[in-house]
């Protein structure tokens, strides 16, 4: 009963997030990676990856939820896909954002670090959030709207895959870092524990105290595990 109550609370939150994007679709649906791979690698497909990426980079307001899903999960089949998150620009961005007040040069530095991260990972939510912070402070409405649309595409792709309440209904992500980055969007904070379930491609993050009473959120990291395994193992 307790699990059901928590699930209903989270579904209430997610329904507000996803209603406009997924009103005509099944509420949650795990990604079909085999189908996505066929679609994004076929030049005759409406989901051909270069076309989707161009739409995303130009922040096309007409990009559909299915296109967003293919864009995000189809990235694992692109040469630039690297599931690890070890860029030095993460540190530079964190340092720039840690200031109590910002100068115009600070804003420039934040944007430079964010753009550098997005070159390595176009779906880096931390970088997108950092750009939104700067554009809001600069009252740059057009730039803010563009980045906000990009962030929404990434968020919808992730939260449309499950409810995160169990290992059977996890959120799917293509980078472990995206787990942490999606938590604030869901109304959560990280509680300090990150555990991969034995013999599985699912892990969970424990949560800080929250109004839903949820203790942990589950994520499927199969793209990460598969990529690392195919390259001889290593850090995820």
Question: Where are the regions that the model predicts?
Answer:
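Bacterial Sec-dependent N-terminal signal peptides
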Residues: 1-29
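N-terminal alpha-helical interaction modules that lie
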Residues: 24-107, 168-236
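Alpha-helical solenoid repeat scaffolds, predominantly canonical TPR units
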Residues: 106, 113, 146-150
